[in-house]
Amino acid sequence: FEDHSPVTRELFLGMALNNFNLTLSPQAIAVGSLTWFGFNSAVSDNSPSYPELYAALPNDVGAEQFDVYNTSSDIGRLGRGVDAIDAGGVNFVLEATIEINNNLRRQPAVGVFGAAGIGVGELSVTGTLSTYFDNDEILQVILNNEETTLDLITQGGDGRSMVFDMPRIKFSGGAPDVPGKNQDVTIPGTYQAILSPTFGYTISTQNVSFAR
C-alpha cells in the first residue's frame, strides 16, 4: 500500500486458484475474475526490509500492460461444433460465459492459525450461451441432449490471443424466451463441460503471444 507512510506490505501464503469466470457481453469489455484460497496472510509496515514477511526482500516486478479485449473487434472465433455459431448469419450470440471451479476447500486444524492445508476437489466447468432464436438448430441440440463442442478465441489488435476449448459439452437447460411484442426471441442456454476421452481434458486454455 504505497499511499501509506511507511509503506505497508501484505503477504498471502500458499495461494491456489479456485475460480475463474469470463463474461462476454455485446459491445463491452471482456470481463474476467479470479478467486483464490490460501493458508494465511501477514502484514507489516517495517520498511524497508519487512523482516516479519521476508528472509530477503524480493524484487518487485511491474506487471506488463496490454490493451483490454473488447467483444466487438477482438473476438476471433466463437464456435459450437465445427463452425462458428453465427456461420449461417443466424443465431448470433448475445452473451457467453465460462465458469471454472476447482472446488478447493480450506482445511482448518486445532492449533493452526489460518489453514493447515488446501483440499483439492473435482474440476467443474459450466457456463451460459445466450443466442438469438433464428432457427431450431441449438434448440434441437438442447432437446435431444446431444453432446457438442464450444470454443472461444479472443484476439487483440497486437496479435495477442487467448484460446478456450471445450471439446465436449452438454446443455443443461434452455428454452425460447419470448419477452413481448417488438422484441427479439432468444435462447438463454446453460451448459456443463465434460471430460473428453479423446483429448483427455475438460477445458484447455492457451495464451498466444502473436496470431493472425
Region annotations inferred by a language model:
Residues 1-212:
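Signature of extracytoplasmic/envelope-associated structural regions
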